Amino acid sequence: MHRVLVLGAGKIGSLVACLLAQRGTYEVHLGDITLTTPKRLVEDLRLEGVTPCILDVRHPDAVSAYLSAHPVDAILSSLPYFCNPTVAGLALTHGLHYFDLTEDIEVTNQIKILSAGAAHAFMPQCGLAPGFISIAAHDLMTHFETVDTVKMRVGALPVHPSNALKYSLTWSTDGLINEYGNLCYGIEAGAKVPLQ
């Protein structure tokens, strides 16, 4: 049985916890700053193998104490990007595998530096984009002898938009604003370049 701590019981974290629990090979601890969402999720869906817990990464000593009392193999952070360096530090301290869904380049670089030489896997950017979209783009490129340009777009565009952005907010609003407000990078002529 694999033991995983999922931090953040929003839409994505709750979905991850459900999918892992339904596999039947995971013991999931679902942590959030209150018990309301994780507990309701477990009760409403009658999930077995999911333990709701109150964890707030703004108090890393408390999270560390929880990890000492409830050993897990991995942490998956579905928290806002700015929380992930703290979570990665906890994973390093406790010798755990680390995964996150961040899109933030600076945070990813911090985690890369933090995890240098770690004995366990540190895998930031495991979400849809970057993450899956990078894997899909790579696979598509392998089907061609030469590739000039690859443009992949990802979005949650609802049939009936209900907000000014005309976008479905299925993930962190903090992350969405951060992603659209910061410089992004691409590869041109084999070199990493900033894009406007």
Indicate where each model-derived feature is located:
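Helix N-cap at the beta1-alpha1 junction of Rossmann-like dinucleotide-binding domains, i.e.
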Residues: 33-37
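Active-site-lining helix/loop region of Rossmann-like oxidoreductase modules
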Residues: 7, 142-196
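Beta-loop-alpha module in the N-terminal Rossmann-like domain of NAD(P)-dependent dehydrogenases
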Residues: 62, 74-91, 105-106
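Hydrophobic/small residue at the entry helix of a nucleotide-binding pocket
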Residues: 12-13
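Rossmann-fold cofactor-recognition segment
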Residues: 45-59
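Rossmann-fold NAD(P)-binding glycine/threonine-rich loop
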Residues: 101-124
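Conserved Rossmann-fold cofactor-binding substructure of NAD(P)-dependent oxidoreductases
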Residues: 57-70
